[in-house]
UniProtKB/Swiss-Prot annotation:
<dbReference type="GO" id="GO:0031515">
    <property type="term" value="C:tRNA (m1A) methyltransferase complex"/>
</dbReference>
<keyword id="KW-0819">tRNA processing</keyword>
<dbReference type="GO" id="GO:0003723">
    <property type="term" value="F:RNA binding"/>
</dbReference>
<keyword id="KW-0539">Nucleus</keyword>
<dbReference type="GO" id="GO:0005634">
    <property type="term" value="C:nucleus"/>
</dbReference>
<dbReference type="GO" id="GO:0030488">
    <property type="term" value="P:tRNA methylation"/>
</dbReference>
<dbReference type="InterPro" id="IPR017423">
    <property type="entry name" value="TRM6"/>
</dbReference>
<protein>
    <recommendedName>
        <fullName>tRNA (adenine(58)-N(1))-methyltransferase non-catalytic subunit TRM6</fullName>
    </recommendedName>
</protein>
<comment type="similarity">
    <text>Belongs to the TRM6/GCD10 family.</text>
</comment>
<comment type="subunit">
    <text>Heterotetramer; composed of two copies of TRM6 and two copies of TRM61.</text>
</comment>
<dbReference type="Pfam" id="PF04189">
    <property type="entry name" value="Gcd10p"/>
</dbReference>
<keyword id="KW-0694">RNA-binding</keyword>
<dbReference type="GO" id="GO:0160107">
    <property type="term" value="F:tRNA (adenine(58)-N1)-methyltransferase activity"/>
</dbReference>
<comment type="function">
    <text>Substrate-binding subunit of tRNA (adenine-N(1)-)-methyltransferase, which catalyzes the formation of N(1)-methyladenine at position 58 (m1A58) in initiator methionyl-tRNA.</text>
</comment>
């Protein structure tokens, strides 16, 4: 089965709940998907269905199996046609919900008195009892509508808003979506983990990949302090979500002892594939790599005959030193012998001194893209790049997407949108000519293109 099209085992997916909140779930064999108050189901029951399928959790009434460590009853699942069918009554829905076809409505809310819980005959205890009896969410909502004394005095639009709120609270369905870099970014934003991703927005991430011209078979230099989110997006651009056989390498430079690529665990790439195409080098190793003579002087690999004669208790130390030897040679190759197709930097370090040094190994006529959540940081960097002949046309960009919400006859922006998504600086690495070609002589530039006409001599 194709993990980009279908739900497969040992895959991380993004589950969208009735409340539109997101949750990351790993599909372990014979496991259970627990969604809290929205119910639970077995993983094996959804395997093989296409990604994007909406499932409804339902109960026959005799279920006794519960999630370990909780009181959530595990139910069965059935497929809904689409999420809009389960979410009828939302603001964007055009047809009238089935729950409201038998209910009267009012043209205005003039006769409606907002008395809160006093107009609802069902109290909190009865609703909790129905939830414990695993009553279907639609049944609970229908009983609440029937028990509402002033529901018929609401307008159609007000009734749909009421129905939407109740579905977000009591409905038992979910949508299984593909967990890509964009979905992972939306999950982290919703979770409120903004410092971890440096206030990065989905629009800024896509713009950075486009400006850097990320594609397959490329070799890219990256400094990612978003936990591996940018590296994950680059892998998707280069390999399309598949563990393809074609080439391509991402060299990640990190400032700490070990790289922080924790978010790559949510990708569907294996550790072997990531280790083959993602190489990590510390800043100290990149700027001051050891020489080949120093590495070869510190260790000499043994041939097969010498290795067979070595005692078994010394082979462990030998293989550790051999691994370090090969690692040092790899660092020398990455830091000294490769020119890169692009540079992407998302770091909290001083960019005005960091980027010019990192760009030294970028090939000519290749893009350089830097991200920061602060405009002043990139302004300082742009002044530094303008003073150098190795960088062409540094440009500062700001991405902003303004979502709109619609109802019948109305269109207005979403009132709870984010403030911004950071800033990007983009330029090209160029190699100045050594022989003076292309330079303009200021003195000659001011001279006229042709000699001025002389006045006729007097006879």
């Amino acid at each position: 089965m194709d993990p980009l099209r279908q739900l497969v085992l040992n895959q991380h997916i993004l589950v969208r709940l009735p409340s539109d909140n997101l949750k990351i779930v790993e599909l372990k064999p014979n496991g259970v998907i627990s969604l809290g108050k929205f119910g639970a189901c077995h993983v094996n029951d959804i395997i093989g269905y296409p990604l994007g399928t909406t499932f409804e959790i339902w109960y026959e009434g005799d279920e006794t199996e519960v999630v370990r460590g909780s009181t959530v009853v595990i139910g069965k699942v059935r497929v809904l046609e689409n999420r809009a069918e389960a979410q009828v009554g939302s603001e964007g829905a055009t047809p009238q919900p089935a729950e409201l076809t038998q209910v009267e409505s009012s043209k205005t809310n003039m006769e409606l008195l907002d008395l809160g819980h006093k107009v609802q005959k069902l109290d909190h205890k009865e609703i909790e009892r129905m939830k414990q009896d695993v009553t279907a969410g639609d049944s609970i909502i229908s009983m609440m509508i029937q028990s509402h004394e002033t529901f018929h005095k609401k307008t159609i639009h007000s009734q749909e808003k009421y129905l939407k709120r109740k579905k977000q609270k009591f409905a038992k369905f979910f949508t299984a979506e593909y967990l890509g870099s964009s979905g992972l970014l939306r999950y982290l934003i919703e979770k409120g983990d903004m410092q971890r991703i440096m206030d990065l927005s989905e629009e800024s991430l896509g713009m950075a990949l486009n400006l850097a011209n990320i594609r397959s078979n490329g070799t890219y230099l990256c400094m990612d302090e978003t936990g591996g989110l940018i590296v994950y997006a680059m892998l998707e651009r280069m390999f399309g979500g598949h563990e393809a056989q074609h080439g391509g390498t991402i060299v990640v430079v990190h400032e700490n002892e070990h790289p922080n690529l924790d978010l790559l665990k949510f990708s569907n790439y294996s550790e072997e594939f990531i280790g083959k195409h993602v190489k990590t080098v510390s800043l100290l190793q990149y700027f001051e790599p050891p020489t080949v003579e120093e590495v070869e002087a510190s260790f000499t690999p043994l041939d097969d005959a010498q290795l067979r004669e070595m005692k078994s208790n010394k082979k462990g130390a030998y293989y550790r030193r051999l691994k370090r030897y090969n690692s040092d040679l790899e660092v020398i190759r990455l830091a000294s012998q490769i020119t890169y197709d692009a540079l992407i930097v998302a770091s909290t370090l001083q960019l005005s001194t960091l980027v010019p040094r990192l760009a030294g190994k970028v090939h000519g006529s290749r893009p350089i893209v830097c991200y920061s959540q602060f405009r002043e940081t990139l302004l300082e960097l742009s002044h530094t790049l303008y003073d150098s002949l190795h960088f062409l046309a540094p440009t500062l960009l700001e991405t902003r997407c303004r979502p709109y919400q619609t109802v019948r006859g109305k269109l207005h922006p979403l009132m709870t949108m984010r403030g911004g998504g950071g800033y990007l600086l983009w330029c090209h690495k160029v190699i100045p000519a050594d022989n003076g070609a292309g330079k303009i002589d200021c003195d000659n530039a001011a001279a006229p293109a042709c000699p001025a006409a002389q006045p006729d001599e007097a006879p």
